[in-house]
């Protein structure tokens, strides 16, 4: 199979908010073009991980090549790139979009434009995409196609008069989508005589083939047996096989400009292939790499520890396996006095953290405790150096630190008007600064700058409960700003508990500390001596609760007689308790940790 004429190729992606039906539309397109037989079809063909199907989200970018004979009688090759829709994976989305020339914008005709639709559409517009609006779910009784068309024009500012009305579930009007792709989206540009230049869109690990790399050829031709160079990672490989996905893998002789396919080159680790890198031929390299490549930086960190210390080796093996498939996930070993051996892991965001944790528990059936998530702080030291702080327990002496900077995000929230007050109050409470507020039809669009530290805990859940689930939320990291942050330690019986220390804003320290102490007071079982539970900033105690001692009734065997006899026994007991408090160790049960850490999240 040789390279196709470039004017018959269409590369497109589907942009939509979670649950607006983009994976179902992809299924229908695959079915209609006959890429899979009816027997092989499953729901959400392109969401290959169970967790993707269950949560109804797409995590890894996938691709499929469809052959379509259009009404003008020509054979077209359509390459569909299925992109992740969630905020945490925006970089993967931007790379997938860079590999296409156009997008289908899928909007639920009953719900209208949501925050993530906006974020992804703006990315598509930045990538100079031609955009074809598609109204999905028009078979629902609640569908209001005309109102949604107006909304698309008003909010996004693209012409929606020719939006294609479809129902992906019933398969209504799907042919019109294919015709619109062929007619409205531009063919790719590229020169097949030029040196090879290809964009690395995504990669994953296959047990038999090693790393499979998804590529979009920009110039030149990729053939089997070529020696290729990854420009960002500066590594050289020999190509073993070249092919395309029709969702099943199919080998081809070569891939020409504008085509999307895969290559395998006995690469051992996904970490060697960085999303967004440029692939070129080693013998005849291209002059400049493709723009927009940046190494992935983890944003949220948290400690993962096995509940049973004997499981540590299994956890290490499981992490290694996940890392093979997900290069944006990083980890290193750490030990904690309270929780034993575990790992400090870096993630792209909260959803990513949840997914990794769930995959560890489900695919490798491990029981895990996760410590409170924290973000990466920058410490400007007094001697003029800068350090990054991933774990609050590693905070150096306060006297050596000049200033602390924390990451801020720019958040866009779309909410029905009725809940606007609650949403604004939530953002205000989280130290947010309002940037913009305007109305889109009956919904308010609020733009806020917020510290990421305040968002990692329970911001998303709170937002959903305030707005009864109607608000949608999208963010990107904007910059680092100086903040008045302090390290709060929790002391139990005057001993600091490392797993519970955290960095908080000075204004929030007291309330957070008090809540934590009250929680621990209920969770730690009573001992034979009194236990103080304290929250401290440096040497200053800001909150305290006391766990009462269990006391034995030592005067029970005295009846009548002199008071001094009872006194003596009580004093003797008091002496013993005092000594006990000095040498006694407080056992904090595992459940107490899990519950205390849950309070924060």
Curated annotation (Swiss-Prot):
Gene3D superfamilies: 3.30.70.240, Elongation factor 4, C-terminal domain (3.30.70.2570), Elongation Factor G (Translational Gtpase), domain 3 (3.30.70.870), P-loop containing nucleotide triphosphate hydrolases (3.40.50.300), Translation factors (2.40.30.10). GO terms for molecular function: GTP binding; GTPase activity; guanosine tetraphosphate binding; ribosome binding; translation elongation factor activity. GO terms for cellular component: plasma membrane. Keywords: Cell inner membrane, Cell membrane, GTP-binding, Hydrolase, Membrane, Nucleotide-binding, Protein biosynthesis. Its EC number is 3.6.5.n1. One of its GO terms (biological process) is positive regulation of translation. Required for accurate and efficient protein synthesis under certain stress conditions. May act as a fidelity factor of the translation reaction, by catalyzing a one-codon backward translocation of tRNAs on improperly translocated ribosomes. Back-translocation proceeds from a post-translocation (POST) complex to a pre-translocation (PRE) complex, thus giving elongation factor G a second chance to translocate the tRNAs correctly. Binds to ribosomes in a GTP-dependent manner. NCBIfam families: lepA (TIGR01393), small_GTP (TIGR00231). This is Elongation factor 4. It comes from Methylobacterium sp. (strain 4-46).
């Amino acid at each position: 199979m040789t390279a196709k004429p470039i004017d018959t190729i269409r590369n497109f992606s589907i942009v939509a908010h979670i649950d607006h039906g983009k994976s179902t539309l992809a299924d229908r397109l695959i079915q209609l073009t006959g890429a899979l037989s009816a027997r092989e079809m499953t729901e959400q063909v392109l969401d290959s991980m169970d967790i993707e199907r269950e949560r109804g989200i797409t995590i890894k970018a996938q691709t499929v090549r469809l052959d379509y004979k259009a009404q003008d009688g020509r054979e077209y090759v359509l390459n569909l790139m299925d992109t992740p829709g969630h905020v945490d994976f925006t970089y993967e989305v931007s790379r997938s979009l860079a590999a296409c020339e156009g997008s289908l914008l899928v909007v639920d005709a009953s719900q209208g434009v949501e925050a993530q639709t906006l974020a992804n559409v703006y990315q598509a517009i930045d990538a100079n995409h031609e955009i074809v609006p598609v109204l999905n779910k028009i078979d629902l009784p609640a569908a209001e196609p005309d109102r949604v068309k107006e909304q698309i024009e008003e909010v996004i500012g693209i012409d929606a008069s020719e939006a294609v009305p479809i129902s992906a579930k019933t398969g209504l009007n799907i042919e019109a989508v294919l015709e619109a792709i062929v007619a409205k989206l531009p063919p790719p540009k590229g020169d097949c005589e030029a040196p090879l230049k290809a964009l690395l869109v995504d990669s994953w690990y296959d047990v038999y083939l090693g790393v499979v790399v998804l590529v979009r050829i920009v110039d030149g031709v990729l053939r089997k047996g070529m020696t290729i160079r990854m420009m960002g990672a500066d590594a050289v490989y020999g190509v073993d096989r070249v092919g395309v996905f029709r969702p099943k893998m199919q080998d081809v002789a070569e891939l020409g400009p504008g085509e999307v396919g895969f290559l395998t080159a006995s690469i051992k680790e996904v970490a060697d292939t960085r999303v967004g890198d440029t692939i070129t031929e080693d013998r005849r390299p291209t002059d400049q790499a493709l723009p927009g490549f940046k190494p992935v930086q983890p944003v949220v960190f948290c400690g993962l520890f096995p509940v049973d210390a004997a499981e540590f080796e299994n956890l290490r093996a499981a992490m290694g396996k996940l890392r093979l498939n997900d290069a944006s996930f990083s980890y290193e070993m750490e030990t904690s006095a309270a929780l034993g051996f575990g790992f400090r892991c870096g993630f792209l965001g909260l959803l990513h953290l949840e997914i990794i944790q769930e995959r560890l528990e489900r695919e490798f059936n491990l029981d895990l405790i996760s410590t409170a998530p924290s973000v990466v702080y920058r410490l400007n030291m007094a001697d003029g150096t800068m350090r990054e702080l991933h774990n609050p327990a590693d905070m150096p002496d306060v006297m050596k630190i000049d200033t602390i900077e924390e990451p801020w995000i720019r958040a866009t929230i779309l909410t029905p008007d009725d809940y606007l007050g609650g949403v604004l109050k939530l953002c205000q409470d989280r130290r947010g600064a309002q940037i913009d507020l305007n109305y889109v039809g009956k919904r308010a669009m609020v733009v806020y700058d917020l510290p990421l530290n305040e968002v990692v805990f329970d911001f998303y859940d709170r937002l959903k409960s305030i707005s009864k689930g109607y608000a949608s939320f999208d963010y990107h990291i904007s910059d680092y700003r100086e903040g008045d942050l302090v390290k709060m330690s929790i002391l139990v019986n005057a001993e600091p508990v490392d797993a519970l220390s955290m960095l908080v804003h000075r204004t929030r320290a007291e309330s957070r500390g008090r809540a934590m102490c009250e929680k621990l007071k209920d969770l730690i079982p009573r001992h034979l001596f009194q236990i103080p539970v304290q929250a401290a900033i440096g040497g200053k105690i800001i909150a305290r609760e006391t766990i009462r001692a269990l006391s034995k009734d030592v005067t029970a065997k005295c009846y009548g007689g002199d008071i001094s006899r009872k006194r003596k026994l009580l004093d003797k007991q008091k002496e013993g308790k005092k000594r006990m408090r000095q040498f006694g160790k407080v056992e904090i049960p595992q459940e107490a940790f899990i519950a205390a850490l849950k309070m924060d999240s």
